[in-house]
Regions:
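Glycine-rich FAD pyrophosphate-binding loop
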Residues: 60-80
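Rieske [2Fe-2S] iron-sulfur-binding domain
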Residues: 458-532
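C-terminal catalytic lobe of FAD-dependent flavoproteins
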Residues: 186, 291, 316-423, 480
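Extreme N-terminal leader/targeting segments of oxidoreductases
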Residues: 1-42, 60, 524-528
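Flavin (FAD/FMN) cofactor-binding and adjacent substrate-gating region
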Residues: 6-23, 91-97, 121-201
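N-terminal Rossmann-like FAD-binding beta1-loop-alpha1 element of flavoenzymes
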Residues: 40-67
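Helical element adjacent to the flavin cofactor pocket in flavoenzyme catalytic cores
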Residues: 155, 181-236, 241
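Flavin-dependent oxidoreductases
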Residues: 218-299, 450
Length: 532
């Protein structure tokens, strides 16, 4: 039998950092942990783009702000994002207009243009060095290189995006052989890790405080408790900016599952970084609308080459290991089929995206009646655009300012779901039902631990218990409860990222059970001796 590792203390390393072009894996602790009780006007949980955008606005307005980050700045999904800042919409403006009318589509366009402008303003005012540059965006279709986007163009014009136009792209290798596309001028790309580092510095300069390695265990509208036992008072508001909002206990989790988490489905987006000759690919953002959709743009690779970032192959999070296939290989084949000058693959990673049924984010007052608690989630993969918009809406709400976009992004709004359960996302229901069935159904055939490859994991049945087993590179096995600490869904091994994912609400844990992101705030329970 494979060697069973003795019980170990949790490591002091940072779980969940990835090797991407932004060097997220090199992020170091720059701010102290909170080691005492504290009091603030506003407490922000999470140092991603939503949390830091809100914190900066609040600190500049004179509020005493404390940001509590469970790992380090940029360790979350913003630090994994592809780096594009866009007013493009994953629903498309044509669908938005047909579903909600031109007025709402116009508000969506205005909100995203405003978010892009706000990012630019922050970078300029705070002098953030984050490789920011403005580029054009193009909607294309790989299935029809000469596609006509007349209906979408008209909808974008109706939404106020008058500079968008159908253009000739010439069909050369610089544009991936595409002959025609829909131009969206004045988009931007940046390094999200450097941007968040700059935002955190700006928060401190404005009088706020940032605390790293300070995980919140539970919270209410005016009090929070950390995993270290520190109590933090929030005199005016709590902002929960943790991607998928964390919850405090079983009852809180169950209520939020209906009121918030169930309104969206948690998905995984894969990305790769490919080496290409300097200047051989047009410096733009390409949004390929064919199925499955892809996004392509460049990052700086230094003097010798560029890095082509290709994102896509979205899938529901928490699938069984055998259902993943080869998403990174599919992304590379997609790129090579269009840009034959592609050289080797430099990076591969993924990140979590949350998708409400309307594909519009949820930013503002927590729909669960906690006066003074605000949440930001549901960016649909528009991580920087949606996160900036969400942080701004939340800051305005805390300050009592009117925001023209608050209603269309309200977490408490009624979504257009199924007729008999209009607030719940049907894929959320399906994924949850599947997980519950897998949880209560005995697993008749277990993976043979001896055959489990090093640095791999699987879920097995031991008596009445489901066990998450990880075999490390040295062949030692580690066992944990495969039950998600949030609401008890069955975790699955993610072979692409080598972590444990929850298919229901989005909690993620590293290979040795350490919490990466919520809604769970707990690590997996070790099960020493269960494999003996």
């Amino acid at each position: 039998m494979a060697g069973v590792a003795p019980p170990q203390q949790r490591s002091g390393s940072l779980p969940g950092l990835v090797d991407n072009p932004w060097k997220q894996q090199q992020q170091q602790m720059r701010f102290d942990s909170l080691d005492r009780d504290a009091s603030f006007d506003v407490v922000v949980v999470g140092a991603g783009v939503v949390g830091l955008t809100a914190a900066l606005a609040l600190a500049k307005a004179g509020k005493k702000v404390g940001v509590l980050e469970s790992r380090v700045v940029a360790a979350g999904q913003t630090g994994r994002a592809s780096g594009d800042v866009t007013y493009g919409n994953p629903t498309t403006y044509g669908k938005l207009e047909s579903m909600y009318g031109a007025d709402k589509a116009r508000l969506v366009a205005q909100s995203q243009v405003a978010a892009l402008a706000h990012v630019k303003q922050i970078i300029k005012e705070e002098r953030i060095d984050c490789s920011y540059r403005e580029v054009d965006g193009y909607i294309i279709s790989k299935s029809s290189p000469s596609a006509n986007f007349g209906r979408e163009l008209q909808a974008m014009h109706n939404a106020g995006l008058r500079d968008c136009a159908q253009v000739d792209l010439e069909g050369n290798q610089a544009v991936g052989g595409v002959k025609s596309g829909l131009l969206m001028p004045n988009q931007a790309v940046l390094n999200p890790v450097e941007y968040l580092n700059g935002l955190a510095g700006a928060v401190v300069k404005a009088g706020g405080q940032v605390f790293e390695k300070t995980r919140v265990r539970k919270y209410s509208s005016n009090n929070l408790t950390t995993m270290g036992g520190q109590r933090v008072a929030a005199r005016q508001a709590v902002v929960v900016a943790t991607g998928v909002p964390i919850t405090s206990n079983l009852v809180d989790s169950a209520v939020h599952a209906i009121a918030l988490h169930g309104k969206q489905v948690v998905r995984r987006r894969f990305a790769i970084g490919l080496k290409v000759p300097k200047g051989s690919v047009k410096d733009a953002i390409f949004y390929d609308t064919a199925s499955p959709p892809h996004t392509v743009h460049l990052a700086d690779g230094g003097r010798t080459h560029d890095v082509m970032i290709v994102g896509g192959q979205d899938t529901d999070q928490g699938k069984k290991p055998g259902e993943y296939g080869d998403p990174f290989g599919l992304l590379e084949r997609y790129a090579r089929a269009r840009w034959p000058q592609v050289q080797e693959r430099l990076h591969q990673w993924s990140y979590t995206i949350t998708v409400p049924i309307e594909k519009l984010g949820m930013y503002g007052q927590d729909p669960v009646p906690f006066s003074g608690v605000y949440v930001g989630t549901g960016d649909c993969g528009l991580v920087l655009t949606g996160g900036t918009l969400g942080g701004t809406i939340i800051a305005d709400a805390v300050l009592g300012r009117s925001n023209p976009y608050a209603d269309i992004y309200s977490p408490g709004r009624k979504l257009r779901g199924l007729p008999f359960i209009p607030t719940l996302h049907p894929m959320y229901l399906w994924n949850t039902i599947q997980s519950v069935v897998n949880q209560v159904t005995p697993q008749l055939r277990n993976q043979d631990i001896e055959d489990l490859a090093p640095d791999s994991g699987c879920t097995i049945q031991k008596g009445l218990r489901k066990v998450a087993v990880y075999k490390d590179p040295q062949g030692q096995t580690h066992a944990y409860s495969a039950v998600c600490p949030h609401l008890g869904c069955l975790l699955q091994w993610n072979p692409s990222d080598k972590e444990w994912n929850c298919p229901c609400h989005g909690s993620c844990f590293d290979k040795k059970g350490e919490n990466i992101e919520g809604p769970s705030t707990l690590d997996l329970t070790p099960l020493p001796g269960v494999l003996k």
